[in-house]
C-alpha cells in the first residue's frame, strides 16, 4: 500500500493520508473516505488525463482511501496525489504533501482555496515538504515553514519522484518581512516599527492613552464613552500599532484567515484591525451564508482589534451575539455543507456617545435628551455584554490647552518590555485571554492588594466574571511596571477603569 499526504479544511485544517491498493478484479477506480462530489468527479478526470498523456491505466481494481475516513474532504486539489499513487506503484514516495488539480492535458493547476490551505499548513507544521502547481510555487515559497517544490505537469511529477532530483524543482524565496526577527524565550516574533497612525496626534486624553497601553499589552476589551470629536475613534485605530509583536505562527494564521476573505492578502507585521459599520448584517460580522460557512469579522479580527464605533447603533441581536466569541475566544459556524470553528482572540473596542445627542458630557453644548431617552440608549447594551468589558473610559472634550504627550513608538517600547517580562514567567496567553484556572498561577496578590479586592467585592457586589476581569487588568498594569506580584496600587487602577451604573 502506497501513501501520500494531502490537506483539506473542515472544522480546521486536516492532514489527509491518500492511500492506494491494487487488487484483482474488474478494472475500476473508486474513492472512499467521505469524499466530496468534486473529489469523486476526479475519477473520470484522472482516467482521461492518463490516457491523453499516453499512460496505461492499470487493469486492476484500484481503491483510493482518504484517511481519516470520518472527516469530510473537499476540493479538486486531490487529483495529483491520486494520479501519482496510480502511476508510481513501485516507487518509494518520500514524506511529501502533494496538492494540485489536473487538466486533461496533464497540466497541474491551482485552485481558489489552495493558497489558504498552504498558510494554514505552515501555521500547523514546521518544515513541511510540499509539491504545488508551478503557477503558485513562487508565491508559496514566501511562506515560512514550507519547503516548496513547483511542478508544471504530470510528466514532471513522475520525473520528480522517480529520479528524486528534488532540488531542480525547489523554489526558495525569503520574504523581506521575515528578516531581523526578534527571539523571545525560544520563539520567533516580528516587531512592527511602522507607526502610520501615532498617539502623539491626540491631544490630552491621558487616561484613554493609559487604557490603550493596558489593553494593547493584555488584549483587553475597552469601551470609550465621550462626546463627538473627543478622540474615541482615533485611540481605537492607533491601538494595533502598539500591540506586542506577533509570533511567526500568529502572522501565518492571520494571513490564512485573511486569505479566506480575500485572494490578495499581503504579509504584514501589523495586527488585524476590523471596523464593521453599524448597519452590517449578522452574517458579515459572525460569518455564515446559505450553504457554506463564510468567515466573518470576528474571526478576521483574530489576534488584533475588532472596533465597533457607535456601539448602541448596532442591532441588538448582533451585540448580544458578541458574548460567545468574547467569552470562549472561538466561534462555531454550522451550515448545510460545512461546519467550521474559528479562533476569536481579539481586543474588542467599542465607542459610543454618552446620550443620543452626544452632548451629555459637554461643557459647551447643552444636552437635549430626556432622562428616558438616555436610559433607553444606555440599556441597548445589556449587563452581560458590559460584564465582558475590561476597561471603561469616559472621555471629556478636547481643550485647546491640552498638549500632546507620549508617542506610539514610546508606548510600543514600554509594551514590548512588559511583554518580554510576561513571557519570562512562562505565560503563553495574553493577560486578557488567560483561562480562569490560570489566574492563581499568574495573578499573585500581595496582602494589601487582596484586602483591597475583598473590599471592592463587597462594596460593588462584583460577579465572578468581573472579579476575574479586574485580576487580568491588574496583571497587565503590574507587567507595565515589571512587577512580579500585583500590588494594591495595581488593583486600585484596575478598579478605576470599571464601568459603574
Question: Where would I find each of the regions flagged by the language model?
Answer:
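Peripheral, non-AAA+ core regions of ATP-driven protein-machinery
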Residues: 1-223, 227-230, 484-488, 492, ...
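Basic, amphipathic alpha-helical bundle interface domains used for macromolecular binding and assembly
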Residues: 32-43, 58, 65-75, 315-501
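Walker A/P-loop
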Residues: 217, 222-265, 328
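Hydrophobic anchor at the beta1->P-loop junction of P-loop NTPases
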Residues: 224, 308, 351
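The Walker A (P-loop) glycine that initiates the GxxxxGKT/S ATP-binding motif of P-loop NTPases
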Residues: 226, 287, 310
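P-loop NTPase switch/communication element
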Residues: 242-287, 347-349, 355
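Walker B catalytic acidic pair
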Residues: 303, 309-310, 321
Amino acid at each position: 500500500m502506497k501513501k501520500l499526504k494531502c490537506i483539506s479544511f473542515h472544522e480546521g485544517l486536516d492532514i489527509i493520508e491518500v492511500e492506494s491498493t491494487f487488487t484483482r478484479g474488474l478494472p475500476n477506480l473508486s474513492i472512499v473516505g467521505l469524499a466530496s462530489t468534486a473529489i469523486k468527479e476526479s475519477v473520470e478526470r484522472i482516467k482521461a488525463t492518463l490516457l491523453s498523456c499516453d499512460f496505461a491505466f492499470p487493469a486492476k481494481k484500484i481503491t483510493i482511501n482518504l484517511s481519516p475516513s470520518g472527516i469530510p474532504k473537499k476540493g479538486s486539489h486531490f487529483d495529483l496525489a491520486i494520479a501519482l499513487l496510480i502511476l508510481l506503484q513501485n516507487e518509494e514516495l518520500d514524506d511529501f504533501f502533494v496538492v494540485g488539480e489536473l487538466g486533461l492535458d496533464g497540466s497541474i493547476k491551482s485552485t481558489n482555496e489552495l493558497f489558504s490551505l498552504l498558510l494554514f499548513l505552515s501555521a500547523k507544521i514546521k518544515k513541511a515538504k510540499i509539491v504545488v502547481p508551478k503557477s503558485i510555487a513562487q508565491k508559496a515559497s514566501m511562506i515560512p515553514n514550507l519547503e516548496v517544490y513547483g511542478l508544471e505537469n504530470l510528466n514532471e511529477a513522475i520525473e520528480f519522484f522517480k529520479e528524486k532530483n528534488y532540488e531542480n524543482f525547489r523554489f526558495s524565496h525569503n520574504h523581506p518581512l521575515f528578516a531581523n526577527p526578534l527571539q523571545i524565550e525560544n520563539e520567533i516574533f516580528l516587531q512592527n516599527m511602522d507607526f502610520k497612525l501615532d498617539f502623539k496626534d491626540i491631544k490630552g486624553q491621558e487616561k484613554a492613552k493609559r487604557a490603550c497601553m493596558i489593553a494593547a499589552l493584555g488584549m483587553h476589551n475597552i469601551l470609550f464613552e465621550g462626546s463627538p470629536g473627543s478622540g474615541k475613534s482615533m485611540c481605537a485605530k492607533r491601538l494595533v500599532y502598539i500591540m506586542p509583536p506577533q509570533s511567526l505562527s500568529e502572522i501565518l494564521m492571520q494571513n490564512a484567515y485573511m486569505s479566506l476573505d480575500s485572494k490578495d492578502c499581503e504579509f504584514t507585521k501589523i495586527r488585524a484591525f476590523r471596523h464593521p459599520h453599524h448597519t452590517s448584517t449578522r452574517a458579515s460580522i459572525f460569518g455564515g451564508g446559505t450553504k457554506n460557512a463564510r468567515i466573518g469579522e470576528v474571526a478576521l479580527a483574530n489576534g488584533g482589534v475588532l472596533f465597533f464605533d457607535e456601539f448602541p447603533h448596532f442591532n441588538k441581536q448582533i451585540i448580544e451575539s458578541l458574548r460567545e466569541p468574547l467569552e470562549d475566544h472561538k466561534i462555531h459556524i454550522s451550515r448545510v455543507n460545512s461546519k467550521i470553528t474559528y479562533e476569536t482572540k481579539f481586543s474588542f473596542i467599542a465607542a459610543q456617545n454618552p446620550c443620543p445627542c452626544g452632548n451629555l458630557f459637554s461643557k459647551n453644548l447643552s444636552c437635549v435628551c430626556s432622562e428616558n431617552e438616555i436610559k433607553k440608549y444606555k440599556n441597548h447594551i445589556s449587563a452581560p455584554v458590559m460584564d465582558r468589558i475590561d476597561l471603561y473610559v469616559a472621555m471629556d472634550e478636547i481643550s485647546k490647552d491640552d498638549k500632546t504627550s507620549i508617542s506610539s513608538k514610546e508606548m510600543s517600547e514600554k509594551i514590548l518590555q512588559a511583554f518580554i517580562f510576561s513571557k519570562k514567567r512562562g505565560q503563553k496567553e495574553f493577560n486578557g485571554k488567560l483561562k480562569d484556572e490560570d489566574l492563581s498561577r499568574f495573578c499573585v496578590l500581595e496582602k494589601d492588594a487582596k484586602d483591597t479586592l475583598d473590599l471592592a467585592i463587597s462594596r460593588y457586589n462584583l460577579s465572578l466574571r468581573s472579579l476575574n476581569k479586574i485580576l487580568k487588568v491588574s496583571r497587565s498594569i503590574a507587567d507595565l511596571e515589571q512587577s512580579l506580584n500585583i500590588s494594591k496600587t495595581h488593583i486600585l487602577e484596575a478598579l478605576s477603569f470599571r464601568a459603574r451604573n
